[in-house]
UniProtKB/Swiss-Prot annotation:
Record's protein name: Keratin, ultra high-sulfur matrix protein
Domain of life per record: Eukaryota
Tissue expression remark: Cuticle layers of differentiating wool follicles.
GO cellular component: extracellular region; intermediate filament
InterPro entries given in the database record: Alpha-defensin_C (IPR006081)
Any one Gene Ontology BP term: defense response
Function: The keratin products of mammalian epidermal derivatives such as wool and hair consist of microfibrils embedded in a rigid matrix of other proteins. The matrix proteins include the high-sulfur and high-tyrosine keratins, having molecular weights of 6-20 kDa, whereas the microfibrils contain the larger, low-sulfur keratins (40-56 kDa).
Length: 182
């Protein structure tokens, strides 16, 4: 089903998901594992289920209190986008590129907070395990935002080994022993 004709003001702005779009539900366009949804208040599926034969029964749908779909929520603006054939949350701050880009010429503006995620800590937006870059990451390593509470301050990172310490830098939680230069 195409994305056109959605109710609730979505209309032609639904994002061109084409045949992979899940249609409309509760006045909101509900993509199912299609890239770049515009008018969906919630992610189509969690990133942990991307590219693994479907998103499961909990995918899609709309969540109460979204209000007008397609905009920003929580001050994250246009964070999200497409990765691994999975619709990442539109309004959750996530890295702009994958960890596969780490240490390969730099990630540019990857990582960091895009509009503010609030306080870091816990798991948000399908971070799963924190980091994911492996050991020995350089300063341009892509890391998730708002995932993992640091165990100690930045002042102790990279000084004689991280030990069990994490590192908080620019409101972004860095995984343990990422060896980011301070």
């Amino acid at each position: 089903m195409g994305c056109s004709g959605c109710s609730g003001g979505c209309g032609s702005s639904c994002g061109g998901c084409g045949s992979r779009c899940g249609g409309c539900s509760s006045s909101c366009c509900v993509p199912v594992c299609c890239c770049k949804p515009v008018c969906c208040c919630v992610p189509a599926c969690s990133c942990s289920s991307c590219g693994k034969g479907g998103c499961g029964s909990s995918c899609g749908g709309s969540k109460g209190g979204c209000g007008s779909c397609g905009g920003s929520k929580g001050g994250c603006g246009s964070c999200g986008g497409c990765g691994s054939s999975c619709c990442k949350p539109v309004c959750c701050c996530v890295p702009a590129c994958s960890c596969s880009s780490c240490g390969k010429g730099g990630c540019g503006s990857c990582g960091g907070s895009k509009g503010g995620c609030g306080s870091c800590g816990g798991s948000k937006g399908g971070c799963g395990s924190c980091g994911g870059c492996g050991s020995g990451c350089g300063s341009s390593c892509c890391v998730p935002v708002c995932c993992c509470v640091p165990a100690c301050s930045c002042s102790s990172c990279g000084k004689g080994g991280c030990g069990s310490c994490g590192c908080s830098q620019s409101s972004c939680c860095v995984p343990v022993c990422c060896q980011r230069k301070i």
